[in-house]
Amino acid sequence: MIRTPKHLNKRESVNLGAYYTPCYLVDCAYRLLKKHVSIEDYTLLDTACGNKEFLKLHHPKKIGADIDPNCGALIINALANPKRENYGINQDEPLIIVGNPPYNDRTSFIKQDIKNKDFTFEIDNDLKSRDLGISFLRSFAILKPAFICVLHPLSYLIKEANFKQLKLFKDNYRLLDAFVVSSKSFTKSNEFPIVIALYERGRMDYADIRRFIFPTDCDTTLCLNDFDYIANYVDKYPNAKKVGACVGYFFPMRDINALKRNKTFLNAPRENAVRISQDKLIYYQYIHYFKEIAPKIPYYFGNLDIIIENSAFLEIKDAFLKDKRVRLEYFKKLFQGHPCEFD
């Protein structure tokens, strides 16, 4: 069931990233937190508390704030001059930040028709990002809590470009524990992975994320280092300057979820097309067939690059292109141990 604030219309919900957090996910977040921390010794703060789902537990000191004046909480813009005193918290007070901060990627094609680009509120320059969720993570680092336990898109961590955008946050916090769940708990739009993430003081780099083993709600785990990716073998984005003799054109690729929505081979050249050289054609054919099985693999792969087992693929490449059964066996082995819906 999708739950949004009743006093907000659809456009306002999108612009504010305002989706309530189901109770079972709040409980999951606190279980994750309590595995590592005696929370009774800390003040709990949610700087985008919405309906205050994360603050309904019995706790000695809990503070909620939101930019929405109808939330019944402190009316504070968490992204403008964030500091502890805004919330009545002492500098030496043990602090844990909890919650489900807004997610709103203004560069996304999703819901562009209802996003209001004139919807603005003040954001400090060093917190600005194309995504509100990343801005919130940066703001948390300024408040210097001992722990941070929040929900956010898994793509903030597993996509290297997004990870680099974390800046101050990744330089001062490290991922301690995590649990991956589906966005279907919040929205009917394209499914993508969300992580309930617990951070502690420290620092992390992208190599740490690649090694991290993420438990999922499918009773499986996801580790980026367990797989090889098509970007190691082909260009994913326009490459006219790199390819001379061109044998075809391909739609640009972002991740597996984008591949589900978009075309593969193009009948005619486009300005933003990927140019295909003869020696790379086999890999683009691989991507074309990967698109067929993409809806059948678990949602938590959605923000990853197209996965390949290169040596195994090259051994069977001719049969792979000709025989659907060969392709099916290859993909079954590639995703062995994960709950797929192959025929």
Q: What positions do the PLM features span?
A:
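Class I S-adenosyl-L-methionine
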Residues: M1-P82, I316-K317, K324-D343
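Mobile active-site "lid"/loop adjacent to the S-adenosyl-L-methionine
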Residues: T107-S129
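C-terminal target-recognition/interaction regions appended to catalytic cores
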Residues: A245-D343
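Conserved Class I SAM-dependent methyltransferase catalytic core
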Residues: D126-S183, A197-L198
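Short catalytic/ligand-binding loop motif for oxyanion handling, primarily in non-cytosolic enzymes
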Residues: L55, G72, D105-S108, Y156-E160, ...
